[in-house]
Amino acid sequence: MSTESERIESVSEANASSLEVGNDQMSEALAGQAQELKTIGDDKEGCGNFASAGDNGMEKVNGFTNLVKETESVNGELDLGTRTENVGGESNQSDKKVLVDSEEVMMVEKRGLLVEKEVEPDMVCSHGADLSDVKVSDGRLDSEDLVQDRKPDGLEKQGTKVEDLDVVCFMGLEPHESKDESILDDEIAHVAAKVKISDSDLVWAKVRSHPWWPGQVFDASAATDKAKKHFKKGSFLVTYFGDCTFAWNEASRIKPFRQHFSQMAKQSSLPDFIDAIDFALEEVSRRIEFGLACSCISEEVYQKIKTQNVINPGIREDSSSIHGGDKVSSAVFFEPANLVGYVKRLACSPSYDATDALQLVSQRAQLLAFNRWKGYTDLPEFMTLQGSVESAPKISPAEEQSSLVEVSDPEPTKSKQVYTKRRKTNLQTEQSSLVEVSDPDKGDCKHDGVFEYEETIVPKKKEKTLAEFIAEKRVSRHNGNTSHEKSGNVPHCEKKRKVVQSKVPKSTKKIKANLQTEDPGSPVSPKNDRKNNLSAGDKITPQKARKSFGIGASILKVANQMHCSTPTRLLPCSDSTSKKAAKSNGSGKSLQEKPKAEALSAREISPSTTLSSPHAASVTKTTSGKSNSVSLDHNLSGELDQVRKEAPSTNLVEDPMLESRDLKDSSKEQVVHEDKKEAANVADEKSIMDSNLTGEKISGLDLREQPSNKNCSGGSDSCKEDVSAE
């Protein structure tokens, strides 16, 4: 400590001696130096304007005057006059030291710096005047160098060094003051000056014991009475998203929403905080859509994005609707190139972080506005699969087929034909009634096994009347084959029925055998047919649809045949016919007592006779004609009974509706024929009693049967052909 004090005293003594010796010389040197500075023109950038020297020395330079003021603010213990004298002395000393070599100047600078390093804070406090002298001397040396080198930047360096020294003195003299607090206040004031907050801005606001929360700024005039009770001067009314709260926040606790989104979004993972961010992002999207909307969009969409409705207890209802957007969301800030680039990058890597949600929402809103301008109401939506394809559940083919909906075009239906599918059960039994159908793909061939499905045609309605059918059957029985007219009327896709050619039966057994061979197959019910078609392993064979006619049709056939047997006109009688009629008259009673089978065989006529004379079986005009006609009626009635017995065993009925209808017809016909049978019996008794009646009565009986023949000829084509042949 003693050495340091001695050094300080030696320095002060040297300064005092220098002041006493060279006042006059220093004044002269300073005057010459001032003149040189004026001639060069560095008055503005130099150390300042110089004045004429007085008795105590030259006036202070402007830079040194400022130094004195700063020293006064830091060191309150020093007097202004004392420091002024010191500064003046230093200025004189600086003028004197101008003529010294540069080595001496460097030595003085080192001494000054050494003193500054070695002096402790308490020493500085006790020797404030001496420390100021040292600091000023250091500044003096710098000024001398600057004056010698003619550099205008020297004063700025001088001021910087002095400020550094002042800071050191500040820290040493008043250690209880905190520099950090002063800097923090300056930063807050600086941030508040930079942030420009306006109404309806989206911001981040801070409340004690809560993270930075997204909110929206409102004007103080929009506050409710409840909110005005918490009003603070110089604060802003902020409504928070999500929880519908509000607060009066100072400018230092408010930050812009967009600039600080990536930083603030990481604060918390609470559901309330995430919901608040989502609501804020929805408002961002609405503002961008409104800012880029054109007049071509629909009114409904425009009203949806035009207004923001705020529900908050701190905002009045009349101020809760905000129309429009903000300046940042307008079309001026829209950059199409950035949008296209972002979409391409997102397509390459679809994943994004939560901190990029603001950018994603903004770009999506811009793309949506562009799509609306193109005429679409919304963006296209695509279904995305999460996870790998290998981890996806496998769907069985059955489930996949059940999920699909099969749609088939309806086939055009025909008005008079219905397509059915039949199955061939036994080829051998059906061979007599079916004709093999050629396969268009495999050529004409006979199939040994089972057929595939084939569509056959079943007429909905009867295409022929019963009278026509009876006439055809009658001709086929005489000719031994089917008529060609029937085969010509069959449709192209329907199979022809194969009829077995045989001789004319001579007995009822042959007739029965003919009926069995004509249709040997058993009827197939629709229910069994449907079950067989639905069976998995069966192959289906085609079968021709048979004509539907029942028992009533058979009975009616015989009745019409009986009426059609009488000719429309009477043939001339010959001798042979009259003899046969006389014989038959005598044996009328015996014929009546014959069995029915013999009566039918007696009635049958040879084929040659039938073809030559179709009406040979009719009754001729003889004197004993009445008994002959009565025997013919007995024969017909016997044939009717025989057919009625054999009819239930036939396999001709396929349609239940037609069967019921034919049964009704058969019951009616049966009653009619029973009446005719009783009438025939009465006629037989009369014929036995009145066998001597004249031929006029017989002719009268023939004339009574003639109208029925006319009716038969009107309903049957075969009868007309017979009349034309005669």
Swiss-Prot record:
Gene3D superfamilies: 2.30.30.140
Keyword check for Cell division: no
Motif (Nuclear localization signal 2): 495-502
Compositional bias per record (Basic and acidic residues), positions renumbered to this chain: 1-10, 658-688
Subcellular location: Nucleus
SUPFAM superfamilies tied to this protein: Tudor/PWWP/MBT (SSF63748)
Record region (Disordered): 1-26, 392-441, 472-545, 568-726
Composition-biased stretches (Polar residues): 12-26, 426-435, 606-634
Biological processes, Gene Ontology terms: epigenetic regulation of gene expression; flower development; regulation of DNA-templated transcription; regulation of photoperiodism, flowering
Main localization, broad class: nucleus
Listed GO CC annotations: ESC/E(Z) complex
Alphabetical UniProt keywords: Flowering, Nucleus, Transcription, Transcription regulation
Superkingdom of origin: Eukaryota
Domain PWWP per the UniProt entry, residue ranges: 199-260
Classification via Pfam families: PWWP
Biased composition (Basic residues): 494-512
CDD domains per record: PWWP (cd05162)
Motif (Nuclear localization signal 1): 460-467
Function: Together with PDP1, PDP3 and PDP6, interacts with MSI4/FVE and MSI5 to suppress FLC, MAF4 and MAF5 expression by regulating the function of the PRC2 complex and modulating H3K27me3 level, thereby promoting flowering.
Self-association state and partner proteins as the record states: Interacts with DEK3. Binds to MSI4/FVE and MSI5. Component of the PRC2 (polycomb repressive complex 2) complex which regulates histone methylation on histone H3K27.
Family that this chain belongs to: Belongs to the PDP family.
Protein name as it appears in the record: PWWP domain-containing protein 2
